[in-house]
Curated annotation (Swiss-Prot):
Keywords: Antiviral defense, Cytoplasm
Gene Ontology CC terms, in alphabetical order: cytoplasm
Task performed by this protein: CRISPR (clustered regularly interspaced short palindromic repeat) is an adaptive immune system that provides protection against mobile genetic elements (viruses, transposable elements and conjugative plasmids). CRISPR clusters contain spacers, sequences complementary to antecedent mobile elements, and target invading nucleic acids. CRISPR clusters are transcribed and processed into CRISPR RNA (crRNA). The CMR complex degrades RNA complementary to the crRNA (target RNA) within UA dinucleotides, generating 3'-OH and 5'-phosphate ends.
Coiled coil segments of this chain: none
Organism for this UniProt entry: Saccharolobus solfataricus (strain ATCC 35092 / DSM 1617 / JCM 11322 / P2) (Sulfolobus solfataricus)
Similarity-based family: Belongs to the CRISPR system Cmr6 family.
Protein name per Swiss-Prot or TrEMBL: CRISPR system CMR subunit Cmr6
NCBIfam families associated with the record: cas_TM1791_cmr6
Encoding gene per record: cmr6
Biological process (GO), any one: defense response to virus
């Protein structure tokens, strides 16, 4: 027997209302409901007094919102999910510390020089907007590690912006000597960056109003605000770089603070995804 989509929602909201939620599972389940939103709204039991959804005070079931159209209700649903995630998702910092401590011991045994970086968001950050998790609901995805149950900044993204900066400053030949190319392995390695400590929340909801189509006049335009999740300001991320040739480390250590201030992630040109270097430790 096919189960109504509305029966999934109590389980989803219960998951989102708990501390230490598994965000990957919660957003994946929520996407099912969002993708079948019409079925949920058309179900006769949706507004029943006996519906277990009502105990969660879900915003689309409140009397003042029952007359809104489907798109307005979807927007309210997005907002509530974003607020639940922001309020209840907690960082498991000890797991991240253990991961980096173990990795550092392995790298030291292999005679690598290690640089331990901590960077902190100065603004709200958008990382991995083209990835699938959360994209169906919020129109932008989140780079997320289901094993660590944490958002992360991919090593490839950090390496890419540092390489681009060094190419501009030192030239392509020096950049290839450090980072390699299709035919030659590079002399420096990066890890993914994981959050270690937020000042308050790890995620915060945000609203972006898209620009109207240039073919329309401003008076005719009806831009619809897009609700999505962002990494909160003042969240610290940690990552390592490691190498065996000392001459490749200095250009990276010199350039990285400048690079991250210009932005690491999406929409940096309009004030998102700006970071600052908060800690650096070199281990030889």
């Amino acid at each position: 027997m096919k189960m109504s989509i509305s029966t999934h929602l109590p389980r989803i909201l219960d998951t989102l209302n708990r501390n230490n939620i598994n965000l990957f599972s919660a957003l994946s389940l929520t996407s099912i409901v969002y993708n079948n939103f019409g079925e949920f709204l058309s179900n006769k039991q949706s507004y029943s007094a006996n519906n277990p959804l009502l105990k969660y005070q879900i915003i689309i079931l409140k009397d003042k919102n029952k007359t809104k159209d489907v798109e307005e209700k979807k927007s309210l649903f997005k907002r509530e999910i974003a607020e639940l995630v922001s309020r209840n998702f907690k960082l498991e910092g000890e797991k991240v510390k253990k991961y980096f401590d173990n990795l550092k011991e392995i790298l030291k045994s292999l005679k690598y020089t290690i640089v331990d970086f901590e960077i902190t968001t100065r603004t709200r950050a958008l990382i991995g907007v083209s990835t699938s998790l959360g994209k169906l609901i919020f129109d932008s995805g989140i780079s997320f590690d289901p094993y660590m149950n944490l958002p992360y900044i991919p090593a490839s993204e950090i390496k890419g912006i540092v390489r681009s900066y060094i190419e501009d400053k030192l030239g392509e030949q020096d950049a290839e000597e450090i980072f390699g190319n299709e035919e030659m392995e590079g002399n420096v390695n990066f890890t993914d960056a994981y959050p270690t400590r937020p000042e308050n929340f790890l995620f915060v909801p945000d609203v972006i109003t898209p620009h109207y189509n240039k073919k329309k006049s401003e008076a005719d335009a009806e831009p619809k605000p897009a609700i999505h999740l962002t990494i909160a300001p003042k969240v610290s991320f940690r990552f390592l770089i490691y190498y065996k040739r000392e001459d490749v480390g200095k250009p990276i250590c010199d350039s990285l603070p400048l690079v991250i201030m210009k932005g690491l992630g999406a929409r940096s040109s309009v004030g998102y995804s700006l970071f600052e270097l908060s800690k650096i430790e070199v281990i030889r």
